[in-house]
Amino acid sequence: MCIRDRFPGSFGSAYLYYVVPRVILFREEHTARVFVNQVDFISAAGSNEVNVHRLGGPYALVTGRCLMRFDKGKKQFTLLSVHAGETVESVSENTGFYFDCPADVPETPSPHADVLRVLRGPIAEELAKTYPAFAERVFGGI
């Protein structure tokens, strides 16, 4: 399959990756279709040459399966934890790129009640103003 068109959607990311110190990426779908070994276009590179001044870049990746942290020195992700019901194997099988994996990977801790209250309250309400369909799907009736 040859991709010839570059589609919109990542307009600000190239700039933000240089100036925002800790960019946290999130994607609910965690499959090898989404997390491929090689992409057709790079909108915002995760790393750069040594002589390029850069304050920001990717910090973490949160998916429906796990939490990963980006290592700028190694220019790759490291698995930090797997969500309930997932395993290192299920994450690996559904990831098309190489990532570091420590010998012991814990389960992602569940959020505390006060965090859930804020997420389901003021954050969900604010999110619904810009992304109503997403907020409805994630939080239900707001």
Predicted feature descriptions by range:
Residues 103-142:
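A conserved C-terminal secondary-structure "cap"
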